[in-house]
């Protein structure tokens, strides 16, 4: 195998490897996670875990940019093997991401999927409609925004005759 062919082959493998590494949270930050329990357990006893470094994901359902901080209200979603939130109807609750830095609502719009590593600051009670709800409050260390996935739903085509499909 010539040097040029070998170089192309190695370059191709390197590109595939780099694309595959374009995942979620950085390994350095992920290694700081100290809480390995479920979101449901943390939500039931947030004071017991205050100060723990957690990793959770979800979908932004509201953004509130205040003078001294930005709050993201997030619907918790389970993470897949790449730390990407699974965008489905399975959730154990909601949490607040409270950042001392300005997070532009145009860059963190409603519906955005995020994964974050952050420190649990405790909890805060707010209303959902008329119902009181206790939100875990997390100060972010790193937030990963996920681009929307292309429609990956099942596709099939059954043709009968000319121009007829189901």
Locate predicted features.
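OB-fold and OB-like single-stranded nucleic-acid-recognition modules
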Residues: 21-166
């Amino acid at each position: 195998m010539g040097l040029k062919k070998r170089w192309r082959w190695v370059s191709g493998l390197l590109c595939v490897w780099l694309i595959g590494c374009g995942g979620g949270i950085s390994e350095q930050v992920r290694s700081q996670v100290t809480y390995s329990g479920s979101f449901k357990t943390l939500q039931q006893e947030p004071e017991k875990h205050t100060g723990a470094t957690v990793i959770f994901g979800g979908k932004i359902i509201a953004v509130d940019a205040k003078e001294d901080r930005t709050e993201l209200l997030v619907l918790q979603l389970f993470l897949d093997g790449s730390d990407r939130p699974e965008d489905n109807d399975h959730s154990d609750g909601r949490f607040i991401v409270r950042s001392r830095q300005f997070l532009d609502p145009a860059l963190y719009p409603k519906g955005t999927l995020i994964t974050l590593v952050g420190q649990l600051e405790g909890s805060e009670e707010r209303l959902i409609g008329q119902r009181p709800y206790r939100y875990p409050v997390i100060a972010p260390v790193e937030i990963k925004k996920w681009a929307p996935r292309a429609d990956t739903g099942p596709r099939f085509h059954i043709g009968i005759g000319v121009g007829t499909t189901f």
